[in-house]
Amino acid sequence: MRQFDFMGKRRLAFTTSAVMLLIALVSLAVQQLSLGLDFTGGTLVEVSYHTAPSLDTVRQTLEAAGFQDISVQTFGTADEILIRLQQAFDPNVGQQVTDLLRAGGDQVTLVRAEFVGAQVGEQLRDQSGLGMLVALGVVMLYVAFRFQYKFAVGAIVALIHDVIIVLGAFSLFQIEFDLTVLAAVLAVIGYSLNDTIIVYDRIRENIRLSRIDDMPAIFNDAINQTLSRTLATSGTTILVLLALLVLGGDMIHNFAIALLIGVGVGTFSSIYVASALLLPLKLQRTDLIPAPKENEDAEELP
Amino acid sequence: MLNRYPLWKYLLILLVLAVGLVYSLPNLFPADPAVQISPASGGENLSESQLERVQSALADADIPLKSTERGANSVLLRLDSASDQMRARGVVDGLLDDDHVVAVNLAESTPSWLRDLAASPMTLGLDLRGGVHFLLEVDMDAAVTQRLEVNASAMRETLRSERIRYRNTEIDGRTVSMDFMNAEDRDEAKSLISRDFPDFQYADAEADRGARLSMTLSDQAVDEIQDYAINQNLTTLRNRVNELGVAEPLVQRQGPNRIVVELPGVQDTAAAKRVVGATANLEFRLEARPDTPEQETETLQFRSSPRTAELMRDVIITGDSVSSATRSFDENGRPQVNIDLDGTGGTLMNRATRSNIGRNMAVVFIEHKTNDRTVMKDGKPEVVRDPYTERGIISLATIQSALGNSFRITGLDSPTEAAELSLLLRSGSLAAPIYFVQERTIGPSLGQDNIDRGILSVQIGLLLVVAFMLLRYKAFGLIANVALGVNLVLVIAAMSMLGATLTLPGIAGIVLTLGMAVDANVLIFERIREELRTGLSVQQAIHAGYERAFTSIVDANLTTLLVALILFSIGTGPVKGFAVTLSLGILTSMFTALMVTRAMVNLTVGGKPLKKLWI
C-alpha cells in the first residue's frame, strides 16, 4: 500500500490553517454572522384568503419580490395564512405583502401585521455559549485521562479550529445562520471529535508497539493505516450531505453546507491540527508508556 | 471456539430488537384533530350529562364526531378535519363555563394494544407538523400599577422609619399620590423620597385638610417598566413551557405587547394552556394588630371557607423571591409545597419574622383572571375583557420562631394545585398579568414541498450509503446495512419512548448518527482486512478486527456522547433536542455495530473453516 508523507508537509498545512483561521476571524469581526429569523425576529403578517391558496405559491410570490427567510403556515383554517418574514418591521409591510398576494388575482384581506421578537432568547444564547465551553472542558479532561494531556490540547485546538472556520465561512459568504445551522455546527463538533479520536487511538497503539522514536514516521504510519477508513467514512458522509444539498430544498440547504465544510475541515484537522500539533508539543514515547522502573535496572546488573 | 456467541447474547439482541419494533410502531399511525376538555385548576371532570349536552350541541352544529374518549382527567373529542376542529372548539367553549378548559389538540391514534404497552408516537415538530398556537396579551397597565404598588410600599416604609406621618396613598394610572398633615411634612417627604426614586416627576397639590404630593412616572420610566415586563414574561413563559416538558416549543414576542407560544403536535394542550396562562403568585403578609390604622390594613377572605382576616397592606415578600419549590405531602397526607427563598428574600423574611414572633402570618394566593363579555360594536360582535384580581388566604399561622430560607406552605386544595403552584413558583412569576387573545392550530412552518424534498433527500442519502457499503464490503456490507436498519428502528423507538420531538434538523441528526454507525462498521471491516493482510486466518482476523477496533469505537463514541450529555444538561430548546437525538443515536449505533453485526457475522461465518472472506 502506498505511504503518504503527511507529516513532511505539516508546515504548509499549518500555514493553510493559520490563513483560514485569520480570514474567518477577520470576517467574523468585521461583518459578523448573517443571523436568520430565529435569532433576529422580523415581521409577522396574518392574511385571510377567500379561498384556500397554495402555500408554495404564496412563498414563491414573496420570494420573487425579494423578501427573505419566509415561513408560510396555515393558521386555524386553510384560508387563513400566517407569514413570518425576516424584515425589519415597518407599518407598510403588511399592505405591501397583501398587495403582492392580490396581484395573483386572489381575494386577500390583511388581518394584522406586527413585529415578532427572536425565537432564541438572550438567556438561551448565553446558556448555549456556556454549554459549549463546559463541553470543551470535559472533553479535554476525558482525552487527558484516556490518552495524555498533550492529546487533549491537540483535540481541543482542532475542535476550535473547525468551529471557527465553519462560522467564518458562513460569515464570509453571508450565508444565513439559523437554528438548523447551529445544529449542524454542533454535529460538526461531534464528527470532528470522532475523527480525531480514531486517529489518536491508532497513534497511541503504534507508539506502544513500535521500537523507534521517530514520531513523524509513527504518525505517518498511523494516518496511512486509518486513511482508508477516513476516506470511506468521510466519503459516505459527504455522499449523504451532497444528496441533502442538491435535493433537500431551502431548509436543509444551509445545514448541508455547514456540515460539508465541517466534515472537510474536520478530516483535515484530525491529521494536520490534532496530530501534527503533537510534534511541537514534543510528544514522546514516555508520555504513553511509564518510564522503566528500578526493577528493570536491577535485572541488567551483573 | 472463536467467533461464537453464547445463546443468551443472541436472545438479548432479539429481545432488544422486538422491543424496538413494538415501540417504533405507533409512528405509522397518523394523529386525529381533536378537542380536549379538562377541568380548570382543582375542578371536577366533565359530568356525563354535560358530555351529552356537548355531543348534542355538536350534532346540532352539524359537526361529525369521530369518537369520544374519557380519560382520567379529561375528555377527548376526535374530529375529521381541522376546520371541524375550530368550529367544534367554538361550540364547546361557548357551552361550558369557566370550570373547564377547552383546547384544540392533535390526538394520537395508536391502537389500544400498543397503548397498553405505553407505546406512543414521536411528536413531529412545529416545522414538520405544526401544532397549537396561543397568542397572549400582556396587561401593560397592570405592569405599571404593580410597580407603583411596590414603590409605594417602599416609600411608606421609608417615611415610617423617618417618622414622617402620612395619611393616605392612592395609585391612579401612572401617578402615586400621598396625603400629609401639612406642607412641611410633605416637603420633607419629597426630599427624602426623591433621592431614592429619581424616575418620578414630583408635584405639590392641595388637598382638603393638609397637603398632597403627587408623583408621576416619566414616559421613559413607563417604557422601561413595560419593556421589562414583557421580557420578564417571555423568560417566565419559556421556563414554564420547558418545565412542562414540551420539546421544541416556540415562544416569541409579537408586536409591542403580545407573546406567541406555539407547542408542537400531540400534547396535553389543556394542561399547557392552564400552566402557560396561569398568573398565580403568592404574597406573605403579617396579620394586622387590633391597633393598626385602617389605611394600612386590608380584609381578605380565606379560599376554603367564608372566614376573613385583617391583614397588613405591606407585603413581606412575594413569590418572586422563591428560588425553588417542590411539592410533597405532610404527615396527614395533605399536599404541601416546600419553598426555598433566594438570598434577599430570606433576609427579608428573617427580619420580618424575628421581630414578630407570636403574631400571625398569612400566605395569600393571588390570581389574575378575566371576564369575557361579547358586546356589539359598530354592528360587529367584539369580545371585551374585564380583568380582575382574586386574592385569597391559603393559610394563616402563628410565627413560632424566626423563619429562614426554607419553609413549607400547607392549606392547598389538591395535589394538582400543589404541583402547579410549585411549578409556577419555580419558573418565576409573571411581571404582568397575561390574557389569551387567540388560540389556533397552526400548520407546519416548512412548506409541504420542502418537507417532501427534505425527506426524499434523506432517503436518497441513505440509499447511497447502503449502495456504497455493498460495493465496498460485499457480504459484510450487507450485514452492515441490516445493522443500519436495526439502528434506525432503535433510534425511532427510543425517541418515541422518551417523548422526543422530531424536527427537520433532528432528522438530519439521525442521518448523521447513522453515518457514525457506518463509521464503526467501516473501522471494524478495515481492521479485519488489515489483519487478513498480515496473514492471520479468517477466524482470527475477524476476532482481532472486532477486538482492536473496539477501543477506537468506544473512545470516539464516548467522547461524543459526553459532549451530547453536556449540551443536554445545559442547553435549552433546539440545542437540547439535538443533544437527545445525538445521544440516542450514539448509544444505538454502538450497540448495533458492536453487538448486532458481530452476532450476524458469528451466525453466518463464525467457526466455519473458511479460506477466504467476502469483504
Feature locations, PLM:
Chain A
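A structural signal for conserved, well-ordered secondary-structure elements
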Residues: M1-P302
